[in-house]
Swiss-Prot record:
InterPro entries: Nitroreductase (IPR029479), Nitroreductase-like (IPR000415), Nitroreductase/BluB (IPR050627)
Disrupted gene: phenotype observed: Loss of resistance to antitubercular drug BTZ043, but still resistant to PA-824.
EC numbers: 1.-.-.-
PANTHER family recorded: IODOTYROSINE DEIODINASE 1, NADPH NITROREDUCTASE
Reported function: Confers resistance to antitubercular drugs benzothiazinone (BTZ) and dinitrobenzamide (DNB). Inactivates BTZ and DNB by reducing an essential nitro group of these compounds to amino group or to hydroxyl amine, respectively, using NADH or NADPH as source of reducing equivalents; two electrons are transferred. Able to reduce the nitro group of bicyclic nitroimidazole PA-824, but not of quinone menadione, nitrofurazone, methyl-4-nitrobenzoate, 4-nitrobenzene methyl sulfonate or 4-nitroacetophenone.
Gene Ontology MF: a single term: protein homodimerization activity
Induction: Transcriptionally repressed by MSMEG_6503/MSMEI_6332.
UniProtKB keywords: Flavoprotein, FMN, NAD, NADP, Nucleotide-binding, Oxidoreductase
pH dependence: Optimum pH is 7.5 to 9.0.
Protein name, per record: Nitroreductase NfnB
Organism: Mycolicibacterium smegmatis (strain ATCC 700084 / mc(2)155)
Biotech exploitation of the protein: Potentially helps in the design of second generation BTZ and DNB drugs that are less susceptible to nitroreduction.
Amino acid sequence: MSVPTLPTGPTVDLAQAAERLIKGRRAVRAFRPDEVPEETMRAVFELAGHAPSNSNTQPWHVEVVSGAARDRLAEALVTAHAEERVTVDFPYREGLFQGVLQERRADFGSRLYAALGIARDQTDLLQGYNTESLRFYGAPHVAMLFAPNNTEARIAGDMGIYAQTLMLAMTAHGIASCPQALLSFYADTVRAELGVENRKLLMGISFGYADDTAAVNGVRIPRAGLSETTRFSR
């Protein structure tokens, strides 16, 4: 198979396409039930496999779940959540996000729940929305991203690069997505349902076609300015 090559210098078309692609990708939290054709899915995941990694190790193992298997997994996750059977491969603790990180997180939550019409003291509605997230926000597909059992920060970095590459590939094909860390809070449940052994669950990515009528999909979260995150030195 021939490998496509890029122009040796920057081109207006390529730069504009990159900007549209990167800025056009967003987390979608309401999906239509229409499935993505299998041929399209295979093309997207093949493209994502070209993501870079340390020494070309390609540590990702991806389980793409659809149809009846998707429905069984969703119900298993909802049950595990109701029974408080939390099993996390990569520990999460309160206070993980501090300072400006917590400020950005709080701003995101305020915007999201305002769009949903949920107040912070409406615990029943908040729990109901958590349940909806465990059903992949109605997406007909979910990709579970597993890493080797010995995964540490360096390998996790490769997994993040793959995840972003995958979501950009989806965006290019008109497919909406939502990366979900919550799905990894029930790692044992996911492994049991999918028959996966000796791998750690890092995250899930729900995907399908966006429901553009849902108010939650109209939420736009601002990004930090360049000066807040990046320094140029000479």
